[in-house]
Amino acid sequence: MVATVNPEAASGITIGYSVGSVADWLRRITVCIRGARGSRGSGVIWRPGLVVTNAHVASGNVNSLEFFDGRKAQGRLLARDTDIDLAAIEIDARDVATAAVRSARELRAGEMVIAIGNPWDGEGALSAGILHRAAGTQPVIFADIRLAPGNSGGPLADARGNVIGINSAIFRGLGCAIASDEVTKFLSRSGVMEAA
């Protein structure tokens, strides 16, 4: 059985998608972030001009970013919180797709989840799994999904392509992501973006 999905994209176009097409969409909103020492991670284009990633990925005031289509840009660090492992980066790129975000509070255990990131040399690599337990109001989402270091900062999404969290770590074999609601709080608290 092939799941059909219907992400409400920034373009406003509504089309049914296969899981593969959802992955293609997620690649469009995911950037590769390269560190000064050759490290690499991922980030999510949260809105035009703004990328969200992990604090441990955003290693300096200026970060080198690469988009899915090969374009490159320099990013400027706007905010960083090592306690919750989130960072916000400003980019000078307005003609880009942006994430459709879903509250993690709506999630149910067993839902299919998809991660996109840049592990090893696999730019835009796909991993899929299921939600380990309902997130509720918890700040972290746990999923039975295979993540690698380059997935850090990239999107964890539902089967419709909605971003539900930012991939952050691996704990006892489970993928861990910071819930989208925590990202919203971080952006509001740091003055980057008003609370929705």
Model-based region annotation:
Residues 14-20, 29-48, 54, 71-74, ...:
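A conserved glycine-rich beta-strand in the N-terminal activation segment of trypsin-fold
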Residues 38, 48, 59, 80-84, ...:
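Short, conserved beta-turn/loop elements at beta-strand boundaries and strand-helix junctions
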Residues 36, 54-56, 118-119, 168-169:
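Short, surface-exposed secondary-structure boundary micro-motifs
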Residues 46, 58-59, 107, 157:
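Short, well-ordered loop/turn sites that connect or cap secondary structure elements
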Residues 26-32, 87-101, 122-196:
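Active-site region of chymotrypsin-like
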Residues 21-22, 66, 76-78, 90-123, ...:
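Active-site substrate-binding loop(s) of clan PA
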